[in-house]
Regions:
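Short helix-initiation/N-cap motifs at beta->coil->alpha
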Residues: 32-34, 89-100, 120, 235-244
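N-terminal signal peptide c-region/cleavage motif recognized by signal peptidases
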Residues: 16-18
Length: 319
C-alpha cells in the first residue's frame, strides 16, 4: 500500500490555489508524443475523435473552435448531455474518420490518439495530415503505441488538458479543470489510509482472449488511485489481449467490466460466470463486479468519477 499512498500524497500536495493563467503567446510549440508541433494561432476548425477526447474539448468550452467530431455513435450509446453541449456540430464519421472526412470539413486541427482515431500504418496520421494543412495533437496515453513510455498516470490526462489549454488559449479553464480533478482525487486519498489493495482485473471485451489494460493504459492509474492493484500491471502494454490462464493465475478479487459496444455489461458478466475456466476466480465466485462506461476508463474528464466509483466498490468508502 505504501507506493499508492506515496503517489497520492504527492498528488495531493501539488494542489495549490489557482492563479490567473497567462494568455498563450503565439507561436506556441507543444510536445505531442515524439513530435514538436508549433501553432501560429488557435485552431478554428478542429475535429476531435472518440467520446473521451470530445468531452475534453467540450469541458474546455471549445465548441466554437470545432467543425465536428467523430468516433462516438459507432462505439457508444449517444450521451444526451454531450449531444446537447455539441449543439449543431456534426459527427463526421461514426467510427474512425477518413482523410476525406477531415478534408470535406476543411479541418485545421485533429485531436485523436493511436487507436483513438488513428492506426499505426493507417492513412490518417499526423504526418499524412500535416501535408494537407491539418495539425494533430495526440492523446498522451496513446503514445505508448509508437514509443517507449512509463506507467500510465493521471498526469497523462492533466498534460492533455493543459496542452489543449495552451493550443486554444484557454489556459484558465484548463488549469481550473485540472485543479478540480486533483482536489477530488485528494478527497478519495484521505479515505484510503491503511486499506489493503484488492487484486483487480479489467475486462474490456473478448471471449477467446480477453482485452484488458496493461500498465501503460489509464486504468492502471485509475485502479491504483482507487486503492486497488491491477493484476495485469506486469504487462508492458497499453490496451492489449491476454490469455484466460493468466487471469486465473492472478485470481482477481474484483473484476471491472467496461460497458460499451454491442455486447452489454450484463452479457459480459454472464459470460464470465458461465466460463468453466473462471469458476475458481474469487471475483467470479463472490460476484464482485464493477461496471464502468467506456468514457470513464479511457483518458479524460470522467477519470476521477471512475476512481470515486472504484474506491467505493473496493473499500466501501463514501463517494
Amino acid at each position: 500500500m505504501k507506493p499508492l499512498l506515496t503517489w497520492l500524497t504527492l498528488a495531493a500536495l501539488t494542489i495549490s490555489p489557482m492563479v490567473h493563467a497567462q494568455a498563450t503567446n503565439y507561436p506556441v510549440t507543444v510536445q505531442s508524443c515524439d513530435r514538436s508541433v508549433t501553432f501560429n494561432a488557435a485552431p478554428q476548425r478542429a475535429v476531435s475523435n472518440d467520446v473521451n477526447l470530445t468531452k475534453m474539448m467540450v469541458a474546455l468550452g471549445l465548441q466554437s473552435h470545432m467543425v465536428g467530431y467523430s468516433g462516438i455513435t459507432g462505439w457508444n450509446k449517444p450521451d444526451p448531455a454531450l449531444l446537447h453541449d455539441l449543439g449543431t456540430l456534426p459527427e463526421l464519421s461514426s467510427k474512425y474518420p477518413s482523410v476525406e472526412n477531415l478534408l470535406n470539413a476543411n479541418a485545421d486541427f485533429y485531436f485523436a490518439g493511436w487507436n483513438y482515431g488513428m492506426r499505426v500504418g493507417g492513412d490518417v496520421t499526423p504526418q499524412s495530415l500535416a501535408t494537407l494543412g491539418i495539425q494533430t495533437y495526440e492523446l498522451t496515453e496513446s503514445c505508448a503505441q509508437i514509443m517507449p513510455r512509463a506507467e500510465a498516470t493521471l498526469d497523462d490526462v492533466y498534460n492533455d488538458l493543459l496542452i489543449l489549454g495552451r493550443i486554444f488559449n484557454v489556459q484558465d479553464r484548463a488549469q481550473a479543470l485540472v485543479a478540480d480533478m486533483q482536489n477530488r482525487l485528494g478527497r478519495v486519498h484521505e479515505q484510503l489510509a491503511g486499506k489493503a489493495p484488492p487484486r483487480v482485473f479489467l475486462y474490456d471485451s473478448g471471449e477467446d482472449r480477453p482485452m484488458t489494460a496493461g500498465r501503460l493504459a489509464i486504468p492502471q492509474a485509475l485502479i491504483r488511485a482507487a486503492g486497488g492493484s491491477n493484476v495485469m500491471a506486469d504487462v508492458s502494454a497499453s490496451w492489449t489481449h491476454v490469455n484466460w490462464e493468466s487471469v486465473v493465475q492472478s485470481n482477481p478479487e474484483v473484476i471491472v467490466i467496461v460497458d460499451y459496444g454491442e455486447v452489454s455489461a450484463a452479457q459480459k458478466q454472464q459470460f464470465l460466470e458461465n466460463n468453466p475456466a473462471l469458476q475458481s476466480v474469487d471475483a467470479v465466485r463472490n460476484k464482485r463486479y464493477v461496471v464502468l462506461p467506456y468514457v470513464a476508463v479511457t483518458p479524460g474528464i470522467d477519470n476521477v468519477a471512475a476512481i470515486e466509483t472504484l474506491a467505493a466498490a473496493f473499500h466501501d468508502v463514501a463517494r
